Curated annotation (Swiss-Prot):
PANTHER family xrefs: DNA REPAIR PROTEIN RADC, UPF0758 PROTEIN YEES-RELATED
Organism phylogeny: Bacteria, Pseudomonadati, Pseudomonadota, Alphaproteobacteria, Rhodobacterales
Record family assignment: Belongs to the UPF0758 family.
NCBIfam families given in the database record: PRK00024.1, radc
GO terms under biological process: proteolysis
Keyword Zinc: yes
Entry's transmembrane regions: none
UniProt keyword terms in alphabetical order: Hydrolase, Metal-binding, Metalloprotease, Protease, Zinc
Name of the featured protein: UPF0758 protein Pden_2304
A GO term for molecular function: metallopeptidase activity
């Protein structure tokens, strides 16, 4: 196989195939070749067993990003050395979180990454977001504020384009809906106050929390951010709806408009 030619894996079944079964993928660039329908070499099997044991004993905290990424890749590539692909992904995107949150089109540019790997990465990303979201949905936000911030960071901190979310709350400040309002470019996202108010009325929401990310990693608000927030607040006041906060999610921290005196 040509060194830079990406292979495409066969779809992965729910349960890993038994040793010696069919369904192995074509060799990865830079990976050891294993004949289809054969057991992986002992050094690959031993390495995988050691990593799995370390994970079960010490958890993810005991593992660097490249080893945690290898564990994810094992399911999609059951009979080949996945270390080269894990290294290429981290070299391209920087860390484990940014690999998971990278757009599918950019992931597909990485040599050796086909549909099965892409699917596995996106399943892990979706699972992480679903877990974080479950800790805040249908709960009072004021008593689960840290969990809310964790969810916002999980869902938005590593995105490469701006996205704008609206969290809709009922009269008891219970989170009743979390909806993405818009996606934009690397430094701009279009937001329409009228659409936010229309949706708030449909949900019988009494309050809102606005959330958007800054792909640059710096959560400092721009004048456009401040102006947009003021327009939403003005529209909400007319409808008798409170805007509790506007959070800007950066790479490693967030900024609260209310805490900064901007709201």
């Amino acid at each position: 196989m040509e060194p830079n030619r990406a292979f495409h894996e066969a779809p992965l079944p729910l349960f890993a195939p038994a040793p010696g079964s069919a369904g192995d993928e074509a060799p990865l660039a830079g990976a050891a070749s294993v004949a289809c329908g054969t057991r992986p070499p002992s050094y690959i099997a031993d390495h995988r067993a050691r990593l799995r044991e370390r994970f079960m004993q010490g958890g993810a905290a005991a593992m660097p990003d490249y080893e945690l990424l290898e564990l994810v890749l094992f399911r999609a590539i059951p009979r080949q050395d996945v270390k080269p692909l894990a290294r290429r992904l981290l070299d391209r995107f920087g860390d484990f979180n940014r690999v998971l949150s990278a757009p599918p089109a950019r992931l597909a540019e990485v040599s050796g990454l086909g549909p099965a790997v892409l699917q596995e990465l996106k399943i892990v990303e979706a699972a992480a977001q679903r877990l974080a979201r479950s800790r805040v949905m249908h709960r009072p936000v004021l008593t689960s504020w840290d969990a809310l911030l964790d969810y916002c960071h999980t869902a938005m901190a590593h995105g490469e384009i701006e996205q704008f979310r609206v969290l809709y709350l009922d009269r008891k400040n219970v989170l009743i809906a979390d909806e993405e309002q818009a996606r934009g470019t690397v430094d701009h996202v279009p937001v329409y106050p009228r659409e936010i108010m229309r949706r708030a009325l449909e949900l019988s929401a009494s309050a809102l929390i606005l959330v958007h990310n800054h792909p640059s990693g710096d959560p400092t608000p721009s004048q456009a951010d401040i102006g947009m927030t003021n327009r939403i607040v003005a529209a909400a006041e007319v409808m008798g709806i409170a805007v509790h906060d506007h959070l800007i999610i950066g790479r490693s921290r967030e900024l609260s408009f209310r805490s900064e005196g901007l709201l």
